[in-house]
């Protein structure tokens, strides 16, 4: 009898916790519905670009990425149209001292900018010397409502020009630290999808396809097993398909997509990819490895009022510990700068950068980064890139 009563009490506690989570998300849904429309950068007299250098190799590669951005936007910076503003307070040491993943004053400084470019942040893991804080990246995305993670993958010699749209807030991650430990034997985590959340990421993918001459969107789910959440995501994509003549939806399962992404016959003709949060996190990393590694890939986190651009690799502790931080590959963060430059209205300058990077990393390769002392430093590679530009 005592065991049964214990279980009943555990159920009541779990239901109470679950109820709180549901009530919070009803409020979040209403906030999404009431949110203002997308910011038009053409109407802004002044654009502030916030810079968050990050941890580990972050400050080293950010210095080089800023050199490239300042060169490409030299006229805009000189005229006062564009301002680069470094935001302090986000090193792991500073965050650990306050035991805050995202200090309030840092968030306010971020909100005072129009777009952000960030290096990698440490997210503490078990065994690290830091407090067990939640991901600062996730908190930034939610606070600024950066619902679309957009990751381009280009492999020109294979005819690959892909763009991935990953839902950036919901799914398994939104309640990632709010699971319920029902009792010693049972733990429950959650996967969340809201209709407004699904609609805005799906529309972002379709709008991109329409504006860039793309004819298909591949929706990647596990809807054959995860019937409600993944099923509703897929239904939302098909409903929007009717609004975009000339753009068709292709369905793929996430396990097949991850297994066959390097199979050119399987991916033939694919252009734009649309994925829920967790699947997008995994598949885009696989695609980045196919492109040449995480050091070559960038991510754009897009919302209606703010946008954040970043490298998708980690902090490079190994390089720092072996006094090789200056040999880190800056290409991922330089590409992120290019995406930022396009987002604020200078797509032609981004294309100039993409072409120069192709020359420097694929065709000419006069200066090569190996991340070891037998290769070029980040500064030497950036000198080469600027000469090419």
For each of these PLM feature ranges, what is it?
Residues 18-21, 25-28, 32-33, 175-178, ...:
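Glycine-rich phosphate/pyrophosphate-binding loop and the adjoining helix
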Residues 11-85:
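N-terminal phosphate-binding or glycine-rich loops at protein starts, especially the Walker A/P-loop
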Residues 93-183, 187-188, 278-280:
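N-terminal glycine-rich phosphate/adenylate-binding segment common to multiple enzyme folds
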Residues 55-58, 114, 165, 205, ...:
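Buried hydrophobic positions in well-ordered alpha/beta secondary-structure cores of metabolic enzymes
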Residues 20, 262-364:
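Glycine-rich phosphate/nucleotide-binding loop
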């Amino acid at each position: 009898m005592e065991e049964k009563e214990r279980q009943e009490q555990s159920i009541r506690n779990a239901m109470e916790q679950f109820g709180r989570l549901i009530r919070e998300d009803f409020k979040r849904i209403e906030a999404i519905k009431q949110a203002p429309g997308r910011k038009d950068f053409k109407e802004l007299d002044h654009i502030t670009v916030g810079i968050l250098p990050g941890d580990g190799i972050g400050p080293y590669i950010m210095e080089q990425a800023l050199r490239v951005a300042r060169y490409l936007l030299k006229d805009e910076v000189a005229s006062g149209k564009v301002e680069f503003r470094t935001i302090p307070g986000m090193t792991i040491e500073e965050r650990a001292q306050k035991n805050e993943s995202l200090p309030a004053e840092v968030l306010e400084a971020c909100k005072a900018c129009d777009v952000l470019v960030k290096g990698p942040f440490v997210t503490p893991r078990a065994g690290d010397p830091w407090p067990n804080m939640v991901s600062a990246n996730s908190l930034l995305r939610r606070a600024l409502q950066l619902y679309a993670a957009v990751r381009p993958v280009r492999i020109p010699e294979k005819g690959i020009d892909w763009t991935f749209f990953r839902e950036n807030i919901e799914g398994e991650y939104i309640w990632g630290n709010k699971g319920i430990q029902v009792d010693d034997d049972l733990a429950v985590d959650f996967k969340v999808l809201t209709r407004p959340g699904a609609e805005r990421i799906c529309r972002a993918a379709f709008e991109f396809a329409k504006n860039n001459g793309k004819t298909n969107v591949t929706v990647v789910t596990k809807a054959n097993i995860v019937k409600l959440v993944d099923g509703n995501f897929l239904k939302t994509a098909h409903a929007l398909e009717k609004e975009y003549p000339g753009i068709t939806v292709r369905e793929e399962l996430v396990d097949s997509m991850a297994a066959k992404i390097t199979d050119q016959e399987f991916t033939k003709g694919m252009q734009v990819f649309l994925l829920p949060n967790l699947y997008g996190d995994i598949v885009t990393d696989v695609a980045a490895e196919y492109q040449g590694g995480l050091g070559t890939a960038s991510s754009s986190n897009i919302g209606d009022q703010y946008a954040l651009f970043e490298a998708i690799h980690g902090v490079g502790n190994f390089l720092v510990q072996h006094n090789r931080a200056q040999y880190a590959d800056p290409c991922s963060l330089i590409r992120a700068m290019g995406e930022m430059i396009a987002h604020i209205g200078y797509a032609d300058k981004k294309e100039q950068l993409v072409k120069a990077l192709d020359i420097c990393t694929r065709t000419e390769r006069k200066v090569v980064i190996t991340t070891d002392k037998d290769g070029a430093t980040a500064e030497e590679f950036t000198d080469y890139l600027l000469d090419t530009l």
